[in-house]
Amino acid sequence: MANSKYEYVKSFEVEDEVMFPNLIIIRIDGRDFSRFSQVHKFEKPNDETSLNLMNSCASSVLVEYPDIVFAYGYSDEYSFVFKKASRFYQRRASKILSLVASFFAAVYVTKWKEFFPHTKLEYAPSFASKVVSCASVEVLQAYLAWRQHDCHISNQYDTCLWMLVKSGKTLSETQEILKDTQKQQRNELLFQQFGINYKMLPVLFRQGSCLFKTKVIFSIISFFYFLLEETVKHDENGKPVKRLRRRETLVHSENVAGRSFWNEHSSLHKDLGHFAKDIGKIEPDYVKSFQFESRLLPLTWVVVRIDGCHFHRFSEVHEFEKPNDEQALKLMNSCAVAVLEEFQDIAFAYGVSDEFSFVLKNKSELYKRQSSKIISAVVSFFTSTYMMRWGDFFPHKKLKYPPSFDGRAVCYPTSDILLDYLAWRQVDCHINNQYNTCFWMLVKSGKSKIQAQDYLKGTQTREKNELLSQQFGIEYNSLPVIFRMGSSVFRLKTQEGVTEENGEVSGKQVEAEVGVDYSNIIDQCFWQQHPHILSFS
């Protein structure tokens, strides 16, 4: 990071490390997937193809992140369990939850056509994620039992509901019929009215799906699969690097929290621990802890900052222009515009390179200010939009692998401190862009990267400007403002003519579309010209 007088704003960042010996679970849920399923005409009560898509995405997550050793999912949710010794991203909660949600969203978009070849993806899917911290393997067992119980109850209810709706009843009539019904009553309703034996329904619907890694190289068993080799990364030319390693296994079990199921798989109790006994009733206090959500301080400005994950490699593989690829920056800006259009509580965004900072209004109650939901929703929506709009900005360049972004949320108590944060990011933009412009011009002139770094070591702004001017004929201040200033995204105000009774026309300001600007946001003039952005008087 660049050193500046604004660096103090980093002191407002809060550590969110999940401490040992707690086990880490990342649970993701589809954001407003009831609407998503309606728009894309999923079958009710269960769409087998959409569930297989979710399972395929979860499998990709296990391949991408070796520290994730177990996953359980049903409907539009999945829970990913990290091995007990994991130090993934220093166990920082916001980073982990946002990264998993982002990658899952990217893979969901990537695989959509594979599972729905004749259905257009109408809009960007997104996911909310959270960290569940389990103090022991017994708590993990209770969590898994809780999720599978919820799978069973939800599926049984939904099966009854949709069979009644298909028989001609209205949704409200159906809900009234099912109100306060118990498990046995719902089973009888299905059998007596529709001839359905609930226990004979596909296990995929009733039991959910679990994935875990096994050392077996190849085998064939009902409901599980794995390959002989996998792509673990891509080299500098974008070619897949394949390597034999533990396989991810997909199974359906009546009791994923059962001692017999868990302990028969040596990889599970090695990575996570033994289940000493079967679980009976789930402790209510455990459930309360699973549902706990940390909230951001009220009446503070919240900044959700997202950063591309390993974007140095991503830019090399996709042959972005150096030091700046204008199309890549415009793609980022387009995604930021989409975020502001999707989330009305976001008032402003500032971006440079592979990062963007989104400012929520200080009075925002988005997701009841639940930190994890806000971060993951923004990051995953940004990611899936990036995937869907790639072809608009790179029509002749294939996306070789899905990108991912991590995020964090920081509270700033006053507007002055918020503006200092934004100034810090723009100062950083200038310093990094000036350095990178010099660096890549030196490399293109024949110097090695190490030689270019040594040449620039200890140089100041004036010296870099002279280098560009004297050696390469480049006036730094004449470079495109999108490179030098970064991008500001906000809702524009336009003048609308209003005819008064006396016949005079006065101007009335109305909010219009979201736009992109390349201004100096350190200067107070910008904020004075656009007081509506942060509701300044």
Swiss-Prot record:
GO terms for biological process: tRNA modification. Mg(2+) 2 binds at residues 307, 354. InterPro entries: Thg1_C_dom, tRNAHis_GuaTrfase_cat, tRNAHis_GuaTrfase_Thg1, tRNAHis_GuaTrfase_Thg1_sf. GO terms for molecular function: GTP binding; magnesium ion binding; tRNA guanylyltransferase activity. It comes from the Eukaryota. Its EC number is 2.7.7.79. Binds 2 magnesium ions per subunit. Keywords: GTP-binding, Magnesium, Metal-binding, Nucleotide-binding, Nucleotidyltransferase, Nucleus, Transferase, tRNA processing. Its main location: nucleus. GTP binds at residues 307-312, 353-354. Coiled coil: none annotated. Pfam families: Thg1, Thg1C. One of its GO terms (cellular component) is nucleoplasm. It is found in: Nucleus, Nucleoplasm. The keyword Magnesium applies. It catalyses: a 5'-end ribonucleotide-tRNA(His) + GTP + ATP + H2O = a 5'-end phospho-guanosine-ribonucleotide-tRNA(His) + AMP + 2 diphosphate + H(+). Its cofactor is Mg(2+). Mg(2+) 1 binds at residues 307-308, 354. Adds a GMP to the 5'-end of tRNA(His) after transcription and RNase P cleavage. PANTHER family: TRNA(HIS) GUANYLYLTRANSFERASE-RELATED. Belongs to the tRNA(His) guanylyltransferase family. This is tRNA(His) guanylyltransferase 2. It comes from Arabidopsis thaliana (Mouse-ear cress).
